[in-house]
């Protein structure tokens, strides 16, 4: 695939005092294979959040690699976000690039912080539903969530995430409770697919084309408004 360099300065929006962004990217894991380029994805997306969503520096929280522990991730979600979100006013963006994994029965999806143990999900990882429930309770005006991850139990380089190396891929159910209408959730892959890296761009495939789209490449009708369909 031929790729052009990303340019977060390609499109500039006015500052939006109501915009808040939480950005997490983890390439290096303590107990799992690397999620190639996920840290770069997050650092770049932070620039897009500033330039395209108009998020001010003091309204951005970014956690990368060793800083994206379970404790720091929980602190960002359950302490930092409540101090930033104003009910019915805040336009919230969340970006996560890294590993995800489903429970053995496929009913729960977890986001893996940098120090997670894939064999002890319920103790060391973040339940995705807990993230959603927290955001719902804070009641922001709009929510855009981008997940460059999959839940199949396989890394971007197709290494198994489980120490037991089971010869199966865990398939997550696509049921996660009712999501409010003001939520837009964009994911890199379906429950049984692998989220891949784009070698020549040095980004995840989803992240690269997402950010290219934010530059205006997805604005098919040239109205300067990016819709979900675009």
Listing of model-derived features with the role each one plays in the protein:
Residues 1-31, 82, 137-141, 160-163:
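Disordered regulatory segments flanking catalytic cores
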Residues 1-8, 42, 47-90, 122-123:
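Functional beta-strand-loop-alpha-helix junction segments that form "active/interaction loops"
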Residues 18, 71-97, 101-160, 229-230:
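Caspase-like (clan CD) cysteine peptidase catalytic core
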Residues 22-27, 63-67, 95-99, 113-116, ...:
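Active-site-proximal beta-strand/loop segments in catalytic clefts of secreted hydrolases
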Residues 23, 39-49, 60, 70, ...:
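Extracytoplasmic/secreted envelope proteins and their assembly/folding machinery
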Residues 29, 48-52, 76-84, 134-138, ...:
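Structured segments of extracytoplasmic/periplasmic soluble domains
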Residues 29-43, 47, 197-201:
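Glycine- and acidic-residue-enriched helix-capping/strand-helix junction motifs
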Residues 49, 64, 140-230:
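Active-site-proximal C-terminal subdomain of hydrolase catalytic domains
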């Amino acid at each position: 695939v031929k790729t052009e360099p990303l340019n977060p300065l390609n499109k500039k929006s006015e500052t939006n005092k109501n915009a808040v962004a939480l950005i997490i990217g983890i390439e290096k894991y303590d107990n799992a294979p690397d999620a190639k380029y996920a840290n770069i994805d997050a650092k770049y997306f932070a620039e897009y959040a500033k330039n395209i969503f108009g998020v001010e520096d003091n309204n951005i929280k970014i956690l990368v690699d060793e800083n994206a522990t379970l404790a720091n991730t929980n602190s960002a979600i359950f302490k930092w976000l409540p101090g930033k979100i104003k009910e019915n006013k805040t336009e919230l963006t969340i970006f996560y690039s890294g590993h995800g994994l489903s429970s053995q029965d496929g009913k729960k999806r977890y986001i893996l912080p940098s120090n997670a143990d894939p064999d002890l999900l319920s103790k060391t990882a973040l339940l995705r539903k807990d993230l959603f429930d927290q955001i719902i309770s804070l009641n922001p005006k709009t929510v855009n969530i981008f997940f460059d991850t999959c839940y199949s139990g396989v890394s971007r380089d197709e290494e198994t995430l489980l120490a037991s190396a089971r010869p199966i891929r865990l398939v997550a159910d696509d049921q996660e409770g009712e999501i409010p209408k003001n939520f837009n959730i964009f994911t890199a892959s379906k429950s049984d697919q692998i989220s891949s890296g784009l070698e020549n761009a040095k980004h995840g495939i989803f992240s690269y084309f997402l950010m290219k789209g934010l530059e205006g490449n997805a604005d098919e009708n040239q109205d300067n408004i990016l819709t979900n369909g675009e």
